[in-house]
Amino acid sequence: MELQEVLHMNGGEGEASYAKNSSFNQLVLAKVKPVLEQCVRELLRANLPNINKCIKVADLGCASGPNTLLTVRDTVQSIDKVRQEMKNELERPTIQVFLTDLFQNDFNSVFMLLPSLYRKLEKENGRKIGSCLIAAMPGSFHGRLFPEESMHFLHSSYSLQFLSQVPSGLVTELGITANKRSIYSSKASPPPVQKAYLDQFTKDFTTFLRMRSEELLSRGRMLLTCICKGDECDGPNTMDLLEMAINDLVVEGRLGEEKLDSFNVPIYTASVEEVKCMVEEEGSFEILYLQTFKLRYDAGFSIDDDCQVRSHSPEYSDEHARAAHVASLIRSVYEPILASHFGEAIIPDIFHRFATNAAKVIRLGKGFYNNLIISLAKKPEKSDV
């Protein structure tokens, strides 16, 4: 089975769906919103071609569920707010939004939510239906998605860590697995494995930057948010917990060791310095803003659908309930790729053990994601300067 067929979130609206388990990502978007607003402010001041008539925006790796349209709403509201601040008396521009993700993404569930979004934008922003046009653009952001110099603003949240393929070189010339008992480039992985993952990320991210530079207008903006390498004090990350859970099943004889050794997740969390160096070496973009922030990976447990902190309940301080919440999120992201390799029957057992291990980490006050926000502007052509 092709990687792109299984590298997607759980669709639909069931209990294991991404739509039902993405409150953590809502919190990330809320943290990024002030930077998004500043990005839009700089974009509108740059006075790009046609920007007063139609602003073209894309969400790269949009996934499905309410978070997809939360990004759209935040972008539209930021545009309208900044225009008001600038006392722009011209007629509101149409905003054209493209939602992009791999072909297997559940775009249909997103389309079902559009009427509600349009009503909300009309009520809160006075935007009449038809002044914000939303369409899907299925495809991989590791290749071209849009015509040359056609876009004003590109946004991506929590997608860039996914690679276009499992790195080559993870099996030796003798047919021996180089990344034994591991499922990604962990701290315990041998140096050749870590290098293979870094090389693949470098290739993918450099290609991503080059493709986006071709699609953006000169001085267009791009805002990226991704997980980056953390510190020792953060504790094991969720990929470590997933790896532990699968290893537990191998020890119990529920899974064969060869099945584990042949499984590698196409994901790489780069360091801040790696990302910064790659942007500078590719050369198409200027870094306008770069910041990191930490979030506990159970942070989404304590917020409601509007990103407000819920009143404390007996469950709030229960590490097992919080760990189960984290397990549900990770299952909604990785179940398709896990089920394609290990089979669907073992999935509940994997995430039962995941939750058990996560509870131990949470009890110790550890378990953090380190996040990177980076705002970029496409460098002007010499003729535009």
Curated annotation (Swiss-Prot):
Free-text cofactor note: Binds 1 Mg(2+) ion per subunit.
InterPro entries assigned: MeTrfase_7 (IPR005299), MeTrfase_capping (IPR042086), SAM-dependent_MTases_sf (IPR029063)
A GO MF label: metal ion binding
EC id: 2.1.1.-
A biological process from GO: methylation
Residues that hold Mg(2+) according to the record: 179, 261, 263-264
Binding site for S-adenosyl-L-homocysteine: 18, 62, 67, 101-102, 140-141
One Pfam family recorded for the sequence: Methyltransf_7
Key words, A-Z: Magnesium, Metal-binding, Methyltransferase, Transferase
Site (Involved in substrate discrimination): 155, 267, 344
Annotated metabolic or biological route of this protein: Alkaloid biosynthesis
Residues annotated for caffeine binding in this entry: 158, 161-162, 238, 369
Cofactor: Mg(2+)
Top EC group: transferase
Entry similarity comment: Belongs to the methyltransferase superfamily. Type-7 methyltransferase family.
Task of the protein: May be involved in the biosynthesis of caffeine.
The protein's name: Probable caffeine synthase MTL
Gene, per the UniProt record: MTL
